[in-house]
Structure formats: structure tokens, C-alpha cells
């Protein structure tokens, strides 16, 4: 999009501080706000980018998982304050230990959706392009994440501490 990209109606009244998470009530409220934001992203992808509904849904589902399973309930972090390190810690540690069968196919969908969301937010001047570029770069570190998954399955004896320390939460 161009620097003069229009601010879509959903984002016009958006206040970043509304996404702060300091209590359980905040978590519930922010969770709902994220659902609304992701619905808007879905519409953007289908209507303005010409993406097929199934693909747009997959992208939104990926971003949804990152935000509503990790950023909000685990980190209690405002989604507008997310940095590339958060995505690295999610994909290189949290996802692996929290998923019964962690795999790169599923993880790639989450990473792609998350990058799509942050690119959209940057186009609307809601996050910096620098942050978005770093998140996108991190989302493309698939060899690193595959190695983290493989190394996790290869842990023996006291090896978990070494694995954990390589990408701590």
C-alpha cells in the first residue's frame, strides 16, 4: 500500500492502549478486540488483496493462535508492542513445548498469518515498518524453527536445560 493508505473504519477509532493486558478482565476484553481485528484483516485479504477465502482464513487463524494463545494470555502483552523476539520465543520454544506434535507445517501457517497481520498493521501506520520487517524476517527463519523442533525430540537425560537455554522464554 502507499504511504497515503486509507485508514479503514475499524481502525479509525482504535486506541492502542485498549489492547493493554493487566488483569483477567483485560485479557477477556482484549481477546474480543483481537477477534474483531482479525475479522477485519480477513475482509482486507479477501476484498482488497483478492485472496481466496480459505487462504485468508488460514492466515487469520495463524495470527489468531499467536495472539490469543501466546501474546495475550501468556505474555499479557499489548499486540502493538510485540517485537520479533516475541515471535522467535513463541515459535522456537513455547509452541514446541505446548503442542503435542509440533511440526513445521502447522508452525509455518502461524508464522505466515502473524507476518500478514503485522504487515497490514504497518500499512495502516499502527506499528512501525521496522518492527514489521523484523517480524516478517523472523517468520521466515524456518530452518531455525525446524532445528528447534528436531532438537527437542532428540533431548536425552538432562538435555532439556540446554535446549531451553538456547531460546529462553
Model-flagged regions — what are they?
Residues 1-4, 8:
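Preference for solvent-exposed, low-hydrophobicity sequence contexts
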Residues 13-73:
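N-terminal "first-domain core" detector
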Residues 15-18, 22-29, 149-169:
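Eukaryotic low-complexity, intrinsically disordered regulatory segments enriched in serine, proline
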Residues 46-54, 72-77, 156-169:
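Eukaryotic Ca2+-signaling machinery
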Residues 49-123:
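Non-catalytic DNA-binding core/recognition domains of DNA-processing enzymes
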Residues 100-109, 144-162:
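Charged/polar, low-hydrophobicity segments characteristic of intrinsically disordered regions
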Residues 120, 140-149, 166-167:
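Eukaryote-specific, cytoplasm-facing alpha-helical/coiled-coil scaffolding segments in long proteins
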Residues 123-145:
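Short, charged hinge/linker segments at domain and secondary-structure junctions
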Amino acid at each position: 500500500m502507499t504511504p497515503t493508505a486509507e485508514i479503514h473504519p475499524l481502525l479509525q477509532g482504535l486506541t492502542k492502549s485498549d489492547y493493554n493486558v493487566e488483569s483477567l478482565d483485560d485479557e477477556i476484553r482484549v481477546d474480543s478486540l483481537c477477534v474483531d481485528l482479525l475479522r477485519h484483516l480477513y475482509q482486507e485479504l479477501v476484498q482488497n488483496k483478492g485472496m481466496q477465502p480459505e487462504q485468508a482464513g488460514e492466515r487469520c487463524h495463524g495470527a489468531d493462535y499467536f495472539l490469543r494463545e501466546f501474546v495475550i494470555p501468556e505474555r499479557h502483552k499489548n499486540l502493538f508492542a510485540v517485537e520479533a523476539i516475541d515471535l522467535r520465543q513463541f515459535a522456537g520454544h513455547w509452541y514446541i513445548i505446548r503442542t503435542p506434535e509440533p511440526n513445521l507445517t502447522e508452525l509455518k501457517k502461524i508464522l505466515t498469518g502473524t507476518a500478514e497481520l503485522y504487515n497490514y498493521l504497518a500499512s495502516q501506520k499502527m506499528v512501525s515498518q521496522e518492527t514489521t520487517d523484523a517480524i516478517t524476517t523472523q517468520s521466515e527463519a524456518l530452518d531455525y524453527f525446524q532445528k528447534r523442533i528436531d532438537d527437542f525430540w532428540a533431548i536425552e537425560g538432562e538435555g532439556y536445560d540446554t535446549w531451553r537455554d538456547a531460546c529462553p522464554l
